[in-house]
Curated annotation (Swiss-Prot):
Homology family: In the N-terminal section; belongs to the methyltransferase superfamily. tRNA (mnm(5)s(2)U34)-methyltransferase family. In the C-terminal section; belongs to the DAO family.
A matching Pfam family: Methyltransf_30
EC number from the UniProt entry: 2.1.1.61, 1.5.-.-
HAMAP family according to UniProt: MnmC
Region (FAD-dependent cmnm(5)s(2)U34 oxidoreductase): 270-668
Statement: the UniProt record of this protein carries the keyword Flavoprotein: yes
Biological process, per Gene Ontology: methylation; tRNA wobble uridine modification
Keywords linked to the UniProt accession: Cytoplasm, FAD, Flavoprotein, Methyltransferase, Multifunctional enzyme, Oxidoreductase, S-adenosyl-L-methionine, Transferase, tRNA processing
Protein name: tRNA 5-methylaminomethyl-2-thiouridine biosynthesis bifunctional protein MnmC
Domain of life of the native organism: Bacteria
Length: 668
């Protein structure tokens, strides 16, 4: 059975107030002056004070072994802010810090440790506010309005480095080789780690470490670094520094899932919903010029136009990729929404998923057996539900404490207004008819004989994604659904959380005293006309799931208030994020893939054509992380996801899985 909770650090604080690991019998930082040691060993050892002003790129990437209390990160962040203040016109504008931690501190222990360094308080408080829950994998934190990115990888560094996507290869400008002393934690200091550091290091990239142990120096040399000794900090006689003089050969183990970015920084996004809005922000943060083409006269008139949508993860005991993606997508979404400097109706009131029949009870029991962190999900008994949710249901379930509801339409509009302030250009009433390569870019033909050319194009237009020749074979489908808007009642007004059953019911929105109940499900349909049958079915499903609940019978749908939308979905319930694959070329190039994996070429795709689609019914949960993943890929930056989960998001995945097994592939 796979367990999803990460063990927190087992520590105590000594007489000096320094945290000490009970498991490794070692301090997290020097009792004497940990802050000055960090500045000397890691910032000085990597010559960052000299390199920052001379860096020829807008992004500087630092990787670290062992996040611990975050002292190295906070010290670097402080130094980076000082650099930006002194050199506002420098090419370098953003800092990206990647760190691996097997036993993360609790938020409380982190805050206690940070009391040691009052001068770092402004940065430490921001880190504490976004400190993630103990889930395995990558947690991306966007700090200082996106100028600083922190990727926290929770798990064993030697296991994680073998799971990294190729997007991290040759990206690291400086390594902080830190952690408990080699004698205290020999399992970390391995040749496997040294080789991974070399693989991730950019040509000209450097490393620094506090130790001068001979096996560490020899291991790093064997990996490809040129090493030298330097005077150690304080009473330590020596430390090690190194440089990666030249690029190492980097074979790709899964070329069929390879992701390519773009050397250009100008893009058109086709869409008008939450996916295109969030992608616009993510690209603008990276310095792109972005134009959004929306088919309607205003944004959020499609699937993103609902009054209330539930935010909670999609979990399944039997699907590793689904769990890894949605658990991290959910926590990223909460951090992202909380940090957005815009207003939109929302209430993080929690979500309770109820076991209303034997099948749903079994599913919930399986989820609870995965040892999920209590911050993510907790069991709630039938006798506890009324106290938690405010209404009687006579069944137990699982509660997502950090879940809730938000208004997708308001969110989309507010994000686009923010993006326009940052330079986004929007063209409404532009219905894309087709697109084709022209010179080194794309020619877009819109209805009404309107045309435009752009270097890069992203399709983020929901269920209309497959209407073009390049995307017509994608295995996606449309789902039409109707959400009913119902007036509150004295009993319904007691509902404190979002309820999920064979449908969902939101607490009332104070802005209109209405609840949302839904949604009907019509696979393969794009019909958005009001349906009285759907209206009655939404009510009846609630009554059928809670037959003894009088409040359910009082639900009134007679006002005929509803909203109909169309979602885009996939068979495996995961989004499609990445390059648009070339279907015909994939079948030709991979005709013998099952027998000739070692000879496979990189996945056939359309150059500079990307997609963000098939968010299904969990778009509010998945869209922020999907936008971040795609923007990072397009910009050739580190992607915050492991290789196997990224493969599960690749738009070509359903074809490639069959081809790897020697099975025939059909379009659609």
């Amino acid at each position: 059975m796979k367990h999803y909770a990460i063990q927190p650090a087992n520590l105590e604080f000594n007489a000096e107030g320094t945290p000490v690991s009970r498991d490794f019998d070692d301090v997290y930082f020097s009792n004497d002056n940990g802050l000055e040691e960090t500045r000397y060993v890691f910032l000085g050892g990597n010559q960052l004070e000299v390199r920052f002003p001379e860096h020829p790129h807008p992004l500087f990437v630092v990787a670290e072994s062992g996040f611990g209390t975050g002292l190295n990160f906070l010290t670097l962040w402080q130094a980076f802010d000082q650099f930006r203040e002194a050199h506002p016109q420098a090419q370098l504008q953003r800092l990206h810090f990647i760190s691996f931690e097997k036993f993360p501190l609790t938020r409380a222990d982190l805050a206690l440790a940070h009391l040691h360094w009052p001068e770092l308080t402004p940065w430490a408080e921001q880190l504490q506010a976004q400190w993630p829950m103990p889930l395995p994998g990558c947690h991306r934190l966007l700090l200082d309005e996106g100028r600083v990115t922190l990727d926290l990888w929770f798990g064993d560094i030697n296991e994680l480095t073998s799971q990294l996507d190729d997007s991290l290869n040759q990206k690291v400008d400086a390594w902080f080789l830190d952690g408990f002393a080699p004698a205290k934690n020999p399992d970390m200091w391995t040749q496997n780690l040294f080789n991974a550091m070399a693989r991730l290091a950019r040509p000209g990239g450097t490393l620094a470490t506090f130790t001068s142990a001979g096996f560490v120096r020899r291991g790093l040399q064997e990996a490809g670094f040129t090493m030298q000794k330097r005077k150690g900090f304080g009473r330590k006689r020596e430390m090690l520094c190194g440089v990666m003089e030249q690029a190492l050969p980097l074979p790709c183990s899964t070329p069929w899932f390879n992701r390519t970015g773009s050397s250009k920084r100008e893009a058109a996004i086709i869409g008008g919903g939450i996916a295109s809005a969030l992608l616009s922000l993510a690209l603008l943060r990276r310095g792109w010029q972005v134009t959004l083409y929306c088919a309607d006269e205003a944004p959020a008139l499609g699937a993103s136009g609902n009054r209330q949508g539930a935010l909670y993860p999609l979990l399944s005991k039997h699907d590793e990729a689904l769990n890894r993606f949605f658990s991290n997508a959910f926590t990223f979404a909460r951090r992202f929404y909380d940090s957005l400097p815009v207003k939109f109706d929302h209430d993080w009131c929690s979500v309770t998923q109820l076991g209303w029949d034997e099948k749903s009870q079994h599913k919930i029991a399986q989820m609870l057996s995965m040892d999920l962190p209590a911050d993510l999900a907790v069991a709630v008994g039938a006798n506890e539900v009324e106290g938690v949710t405010g209404v009687v249901t006579n069944c137990g379930g699982i509660t997502y404490p950090q879940g809730g509801w938000l208004c997708p339409a308001e969110l989309t509009r507010s994000v686009l207004e923010l993006a326009q302030q940052q330079g986004l250009q929007i063209r409404y009433q532009h219905q894309l008819q087709d697109l084709s390569r022209k010179d080194d870019g794309w020619l877009l033909n819109f209805a009404g004989d309107q045309q435009a050319t752009h270097s890069v194009v992203v399709l983020a237009n929901g269920h209309q994604i497959s209407r073009f020749s390049q995307t017509s074979s994608l295995p996606v489908y449309s789902v039409a659904g109707q959400v009913s808007h119902i007036p509150t009642t004295p009993e319904l007004a007691k509902l404190k959380q979002v309820l999920c059953y064979d449908g969902y019911l939101t607490p009332q929105n104070p802005a209109n005293q209405h609840h949302c109940i839904g949604a009907s499900y019509h696979r393969g349909s794009e019909d958005t006309a009001y349906s009285e049958d759907d209206q009655q079915q939404n009510r009846q499903r609630l009554i059928d799931c809670f037959p003894q609940a009088q409040w359910a019978k009082e639900v009134d749908v007679s006002e005929k208030e509803a909203r109909c939308g169309v979602r885009c979905a996939t068979r495996d319930h995961l989004p499609m994020v990445g390059n648009v694959p070339d279907y015909e070329a994939t079948l030709v190039e991979y005709a013998s893939l099952a027998e000739q994996k070692d000879k496979a070429v990189s996945a056939p795709v359309y150059d500079d054509l990307f997609m963000l689609a098939a968010l299904g019914s969990r778009g509010l949960c998945s869209a922020p992380l999907c936008a971040e993943i795609l923007a990072a890929q397009m910009s050739d930056e580190p992607i915050p996801m492991d290789a196997s989960t990224l493969a599960a998001l690749n738009p070509n995945r359903l074809w490639v899985r069959k081809l790897l097994k020697g099975k025939a592939v059909k379009a659609g």
